[in-house]
Amino acid sequence: MPARARPARRHKWVPLALCFALFALPLFVIHLPFLHLPFFWDELGQFIPTALDLFRHGAWIAHSTTPNVHPPGVEAYLVLWYELFGYSIAITRVAMLVLGSFGLLLTFLLAIRLSRGTPGAPAFLPPLLLLASPLFFTQSMMAQLDMPAMVFTLLALLLFLREQYAAAAAASVVLVLTKETGLVVPFVFFLALVAQRKWKRAGYFVAPAAALGLWLIVLHNGTGYWLGNPGFAHYNVGYALHPVHVAFSFVRRVYYLFIAEFRWIGLVALLLALRNRATRRVFHSPAWRVTIAVAAAQIVLVSVLGGAELERYLLPVLPLFYIAVSIALAAFRRRVSFAATAALVAGLVACLFWNPPYPFPYEDNLAMVDFVHLQQIAARFAERN
């Protein structure tokens, strides 16, 4: 390699590192009060015990909690941190926030790619909207699967749109070993390439299915069940496939993604902006067709499968919606765009503290912190009595 090429390649990483720091700094600052927050719900009941089984005993299949179909990708990532710095709540939170920072960076890079032909600099808005979102705020520090799945979905999609198909397939392998439902993403890529008769490149995206299949074989050999345990299979497949459950789940997904937490402001802006020919042209691009297919496939999959209708399952789609909203807002006059953006950001931040007037998972906003503190009070009371 010529001597001049090596410094040039190194310099390409400098802007990315600066952007990563730009996004990581506010994310870490706003989470400083919560770095020692005790684990919550699925963290304590599933993912941390699984990670500790791997860390302390080298067991890829959990034995201190009930095993299930979820691949151990996130747990393996946490074990790397535990090997370097030791196990603690704070180290776990920091490890997840690092991944969340990459999620903000990838949202920005993907927004640049998808907003080509749009006036202004709309790519800066989606990371801001994601940072202000209550769901991302809580999930970015929690040892769960959906925020990491969001990160690798964005990475795989970005690489695919850049026509780096082998790298996109590799990112997809990591994605499905992070969360099994991520398989829908390389499946969309496979179909897109088959439609273009790019058979060899489409073949790359068989690798994620093979990786997930290998994990299922390991899980079956260790537990005797393809999904880890019969209760998990019944609740997340058998029960979930009831038509009433599917219909209700789909409505709930649509409501949360497009209306809840003042996202209806973005939806209205998007619908109005689509009346503009230039905006429609952006969304009719091949890149957006693939992106919309990925988002739609994710929404349908998490509506059909999964007994718990948790909003965190929509995390991989949320940045894509924010990118679409940012492009739509760029089509309006500056005052209108600024007012709508300010209202949307303010609404998202308010919903971090304000609980909706209907039942919701506490992990969707800061109610999870209140609940953890309540559990601490109850534990101290139980110890004294």
PLM feature segments, named:
Residues 20, 94-116:
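Transmembrane-helix motifs of polytopic, lipid-linked glycan transferases
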Residues 29-30, 199-273, 297-301, 305, ...:
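Membrane-lumen/periplasm interface segments of specific transmembrane helices
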Residues 23-27, 123-134, 158, 172-176, ...:
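Short helix- or helix-capping micro-motifs
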